[in-house]
């Protein structure tokens, strides 16, 4: 009760300030950690981006830095790291955490109790250890999550064209937000269903809105992409887009597909060609489950995007820790307490009555436990050269199953919520 009273008295601005202070402390700690420890706190990807920015500032191309495989706009964004001090880029990425929390809170306020909204933002973004670690180590993935949450915030306020424009720009930074196009399109249809009982009118209105949204998204994607292509040519397309389609990572990859990639690499080295393409093997189940989830959870776009992202990460041919920040902030939409739901006789309320906290905690802990299990299994193979391929692949399969079980639980919660009368009234706008 004391904690509940405390969260009631703390404003969102104070929570954001505390989150910012914590991130400043971690960024400062990283400077000393990197000086004294062999394993650096700073992510290697951050060093690559800063090096790319340095090449750009010196009149060259960010792609002059080997393994720079991002949009040049990212290098331009961290240019203060060259002008002022190296950690400036980390401050920019950490600021995206705060922006993500702001937009997440804005969406939550439309259907969740204020206390619950604060708790969710604190738990899944501001003080979440994975989110904290990823952004303060200098990884840019939360920047795209920030834009994805901005899309949902615009959509929740019926600003569909603005949402589409932001989505197109987000896809320019990373390809994966394109998966939100289908649930957003179905969300537009559901909005038209709520606004009119005439089927023909709904179809026409949806077609017009979706067409304009598609045009807005295409323009906001094409403009920066064409400008970057005009400046850096085919190398930009190869590194920023095409590479990620053909990417095969057999190291630091939680996905079970890493073994197939490793065997393919060995066959190519021996000149024997490739038996199976991970792209095709991974894409087919991804497309099926994402389409199915989008349709079943179409009445709640926020829920659909959350479950979609978990499944996308689970079925992706490459999965690393920073990918977790793609979906962790979205969990706030599923575990919040809707404002228009009264406590029931058993003491549960809102979304809390749709699942057992014990069961939910067990599933989350099961998924979380597979992470250190995978790391401890991978270290002997990846750093010491021990031949533990079979053992690591089995652990990767366990991680995949844990992700699927987590997604299944989230989908069950979301479906039960949207099937209730209260969710139709209070959550549909999201």
Swiss-Prot record:
Transmembrane annotation, as ranges: 12-32, 73-93, 116-136, 164-184, 207-227, 361-381, 389-409
Record pathway: Glycolipid biosynthesis; glycosylphosphatidylinositol-anchor biosynthesis
Highest taxon of the lineage: Eukaryota
Cellular component, GO, one term: cytoplasm
Pfam families: Mannosyl_trans
Recorded topology in the membrane: Multi-pass membrane protein
Protein EC: 2.4.1.-
Compartments, as annotated in UniProt: Endoplasmic reticulum membrane
Principal place of residence: endoplasmic reticulum
Sorted UniProt keywords: Endoplasmic reticulum, Glycosyltransferase, GPI-anchor biosynthesis, Membrane, Transferase, Transmembrane, Transmembrane helix
Cytoplasmic face of the membrane: 1-11, 94-115, 185-206, 382-388
MF-aspect GO terms: alpha-1,4-mannosyltransferase activity; glycolipid mannosyltransferase activity; mannosyltransferase activity
Gene Ontology annotations of biological process type: GPI anchor biosynthetic process
Purpose: Mannosyltransferase involved in glycosylphosphatidylinositol-anchor biosynthesis. Transfers the first alpha-1,4-mannose to GlcN-PI during GPI precursor assembly.
Family recorded in the similarity comment: Belongs to the PIGM family.
PANTHER family: GPI MANNOSYLTRANSFERASE 1 (PTHR12886:SF0), PIG-M MANNOSYLTRANSFERASE (PTHR12886)
Listed name of the protein: GPI mannosyltransferase 1
